[in-house]
Amino acid sequence: LYTIPTFQNPTGIVMPMPRRKKLLQYCNEMHIPIIEDDVFRDLWLDAPPPPPIKSLDGHGNVVYISSLSKCFAPGLRLGWLVGPEAVVQRLADVKMQMDYGVSVLTQQVAEELLRTGLYEKGVQNIRSQLTERRDFMIRLLERYFSEFAEWSVPSGSFFVWVRLKNRVSAEKLFNLALKEKLLIMPGGVYDRGHSSS
């Protein structure tokens, strides 16, 4: 089972702790491994999110993945995973076959950022900017869209999931927005089962 329980893309939803526990319990009972993608964790704006599902994992059933790319530096293509040793070893082998591993320089830059506190300082600055941008976006939505749409104020990351009250051609809306230099992603992009309206 693959999940983004913290600031899920595209909805921005955070899975509450009781649901995390219930999901882990169910997957343990059914022998279903969990891949927890937690790349947005450090982009909380209002309050830190619940601990990762991996922190509750006493059976080695969760593979936890994260990265510096989403929260800090998109160009710093470095990620990591935590999981059972056999899984980690196998995935490391696959990674080596694909691209011979991550640059040593990239790893040294990441180590320096994390060791010196520069990462946390930078993320605090990013959180501050994201909070301003989120608040600005919500003000614009309230001012211009409140009669046409509904949304939730995200508590982290950079996603605002907007639900239109009336049926609209998502493709047409996408193209009109693009002409105004505004990028929106229709919900159907994220779900094969939904139509483009």
How would you label these PLM feature ranges?
Residues 2-197:
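PLP-dependent class I/II
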